[in-house]
Regions:
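Long, charged amphipathic helices and adjacent flexible linkers at domain junctions
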Residues: 12-33
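Helix-hairpin-helix
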Residues: 1-9
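Active-site-proximal loop/helix of nucleotide/amide-processing enzymes and allied scaffolds
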Residues: 4-5, 34, 56, 66, ...
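Short loop/turn microsegments at loop-to-beta-strand junctions
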Residues: 47-49, 128
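Short hydrophobic alpha-helical segments used for membrane anchoring or interfacial signaling
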Residues: 51-54
């Protein structure tokens, strides 16, 4: 039964990923959020996921960059931007989960998001958004006015 559920989850994530990320990623923000929610909201530890995008906002790479503990995933802006340069990315979408179930951003979430955005600007790499997903929903830091 568990193997069947894992297969079903994998198929669902594949379908959501294809729908959300096949064209320009910014074309359907709700589809991207739905994919990230399905992929991350129920994970038992914090993860930082990075969507690396090209100049046409098409996906170059969807990568789990960092896996942390139950309440923290250390974000290293230098490493995120180094990887962006390696990939030839011109834009990013960050996403991380809150295993606590509450997607509200912490002060540190906001500070690090702004740090990545500012450092990225110097390298011509735009941070389009940072989504925080949890079992109870998701929040866009851009829509929330934090970016």
């Amino acid at each position: 039964m568990l193997a069947w559920l894992a297969t079903l989850r994998s198929a669902m994530l594949h379908a959501l990923r294809r729908e959300a990320l096949q064209g320009p990623v910014l074309g359907d923000a709700d589809a991207v959020a739905a994919y990230l929610f399905a992929a991350m909201a129920h994970e038992p530890v914090e993860q930082l996921r990075v969507l690396y995008l090209n100049a046409r906002n098409r996906l170059l790479l969807d990568e789990t960059a960092i896996e942390g503990s139950v309440n923290v995933a250390p974000i290293y802006p230098r490493e995120i931007l180094r990887r962006s340069l390696e990939m030839g990315a011109t834009a990013l979408i960050l996403a991380h989960n809150h295993p606590s179930g509450d997607p509200k951003p912490s002060r540190e979430d906001i500070r690090l998001t702004r740090l990545v955005a500012t450092a990225g600007e110097a390298l011509d790499i735009r941070l389009h958004d940072h989504l925080i997903v949890a079992r109870s929903g998701w929040i866009s830091l851009r829509a929330g006015g934090y970016l």
